[in-house]
Structures are given as structure tokens and as C-alpha cells.
Swiss-Prot record:
Organism (species): Yarrowia lipolytica (strain CLIB 122 / E 150) (Yeast)
Origin superkingdom: Eukaryota
This protein's name: Phosphatidylglycerol/phosphatidylinositol transfer protein
Record-level Gene Ontology MF annotations: sterol binding
Signal sequence residues: 1-17
InterPro entries found in the cross-reference section: Ig_E-set (IPR014756), ML_dom (IPR003172), ML_PG-PI_TP (IPR033917), NPC2-like (IPR039670)
Quaternary structure note: Monomer.
Family: Belongs to the NPC2 family.
One GO biological process term: intracellular sterol transport
Transmembrane segments: none
Lineage: Eukaryota, Fungi, Dikarya, Ascomycota, Saccharomycotina
Function (record text): Catalyzes the intermembrane transfer of phosphatidylglycerol and phosphatidylinositol.
Keyword Amino-acid biosynthesis annotated: no
Propeptide: 18-52
Length: 189
């Protein structure tokens, strides 16, 4: 059975684990690395709209955010290996859940990634296009979902604390899920 929507989990983890998809993001990360923690407008508190986060069963640094709102995806289990993620290693993501409604073309993900207090990424992505990265396609049918995916993490991730939030919405702006994760990559010896 071909299942999708959990690519959002892979995306949230992958975005945090390899947060420099373009030259601007890499430039910001290098500035943060060189100059230490900078205080930019905003701060970490605005990355997730609420403090009502819920742990997801399993072994991962990813939690469910905006838990007080109805969400179309119930994540039953989520584990990553290794936990915490490590530079230069493969990251294995295993997840299962239940999707209560079909997700059609036009669904989207709002992603924000911060390195300390510096916002690296704030963008809206097409959920169906992102699903293709894990060999899935839209429409995503309601029902039981499973994910088992490996992501290669580069050695070049600058050390520091990364915080990411990913909120997925249907084409009608109904919340599919909200995922929040914090990962710290130590300095290499």
C-alpha cells in the first residue's frame, strides 16, 4: 500500500539536519558561526505559535505543536536513528500515523528554521512536490500511513542549535499537522 503525508516528518527533520539548501542560508549560517549568537528581530519564541506542544511516541526530538487545534494527521509513532542526528551519518526515520481526510493538490507546508536567533529559512512549500522526495504522490488518501526513509546528512553542518517548525495545510487551509524540533550539532574535534 503506497502511503504518504509523513514526508512532512522527513522534511522537518531533513530541513533541520541539513538547513542550507541555498547560498543565502549558507551565508547566514556562516555569519552566525563566525560571530556567535546574534539577537535578531523576533526570537525563538515566535517560531511556534503556542506552548502547547505534545511529545510524539517514539524516539525523536520532534514534537507536535499547535496541539490545541484539530489536526488531520494523528502521528502514532516517530523514531529517528541516530537520535540525536549526527553530521556525516545517515538518518533513518520511521513513522506511522492516521490521516483523517484525503489531501489534494494545492496542500502546502510553511517551514521556518532558525540557527540560534537567526532565521535561516521561512518559506512555503508545495506538500505534493515534497511528497515526491519520498516516492509518494498526491492525492494522499485517508487511512493508515507508514514511513521508513533514510536521509544522508552532510559533514558540513555548522555546529549550533537549530529549531524548525513545519505546519502542513490542506488546499482549504485546514491544519494537517504541526511539527516542532530542536537539534544541536556539536563542534567537531
Amino acid at each position: 500500500m503506497k502511503l504518504s503525508i509523513l514526508p512532512l516528518i522527513a522534511l522537518a527533520t531533513a530541513v533541520v539536519a541539513s538547513p542550507a539548501p541555498d547560498a543565502n542560508s549558507m551565508k547566514l549560517m556562516n555569519q552566525a558561526k563566525d560571530f556567535g549568537m546574534s539577537v535578531a528581530q523576533g526570537g525563538l519564541k515566535d517560531i511556534a505559535k503556542t506552548l502547547d506542544d505534545e511529545d510524539i511516541p517514539g524516539d525523536s526530538p520532534i514534537s507536535l505543536c499547535d496541539a490545541e487545534y484539530e489536526q488531520l494527521l494523528e502521528i502514532k509513532h516517530l523514531s529517528i536513528d541516530p537520535n540525536p542526528p549526527a553530521k556525516g551519518q545517515n538518518l533513518t526515520i520511521e513513522a506511522s500515523g492516521y490521516l483523517y481526510e484525503d489531501v489534494e493538490e494545492g496542500a502546502y507546508i510553511e517551514v521556518e528554521v532558525r540557527y540560534g536567533y537567526i532565521r535561516l529559512i521561512s518559506q512555503t512549500l508545495d506538500l505534493c512536490e515534497q511528497s515526491e522526495q519520498v516516492d509518494w504522490s498526491c492525492p494522499i488518501k485517508a487511512g493508515d500511513l507508514k514511513l521508513n526513509k533514510q536521509i544522508e546528512l552532510p559533514n558540513e553542518i555548522p555546529p549550533g542549535k537549530y529549531v524548525a517548525v513545519a505546519r502542513a495545510y490542506t488546499v482549504d487551509d485546514d491544519l494537517i499537522t504541526c511539527l516542532l524540533t530542536t537539534v544541536t550539532f556539536p563542534a567537531s574535534l
